[in-house]
A protein has these predicted regions:
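Extracytoplasmic
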Residues: 2-160
Length: 160
């Protein structure tokens, strides 16, 4: 057993230590602080949209807040959740289907994290997958609710 301790320690560090992560960081300290207090700043029935590859899925697992994407896996084709990432950049534009999709999913909030270096993590943020468009923060139609460092929670006002 004693021989395995260094291996286990290195394995844990490769996943959780920001200076030794091998794959990419999903959460920074700032994002974690925001997520931990999100339940106290959002309504109880809030549903949040955001890129799971930038930590949005942790709003559900750590913060207890409903999210559109609770994992980094892509949503089943043909569902509103599968269509929403490609529609998201058109929020507020005439003829956009974004608000229709958001309304079908009950989404009123958006989570963003803009620090691609993940607070100086050696490998930076985890690579984006199908959720890359969900890292774009529209210039209109959002109202800041709370932020910590590069992590922010927004109320979506474009669909009011």
């Amino acid at each position: 057993v004693a021989e395995r301790v260094p291996l286990e320690r290195n394995l844990v560090a490769s996943v959780y230590d920001p200076q030794r992560i091998k794959y990419g960081t999903l959460l920074t300290e700032d994002a974690l602080a925001l997520i931990e207090r999100s339940r106290s700043v959002l309504p109880q029935d809030a549903v949040v949209l955001g890129a799971p590859s930038r930590g949005a899925a942790h709003l559900w697992s750590v913060g207890g807040v409903h999210v559109v994407y609770p994992t980094r896996d892509q949503t089943a084709p043909g569902t509103p959740g599968a269509t929403l990432p490609s529609a998201w950049p058109t929020l507020g534009q005439k003829g956009s289907q974004t608000c229709t999709l958001l309304n079908r999913l009950g989404v009123r909030y958006f989570y963003s994290r803009s620090d691609a270096t993940a607070s100086g993590s050696v490998t930076g943020a985890a690579p984006l997958r199908w959720d890359s468009r969900l890292t774009q923060v529209p210039s209109e139609g959002l109202e800041l609710v709370d932020s910590e460092g590069s992590a922010s929670l927004w109320r979506i006002t474009a669909c009011d």
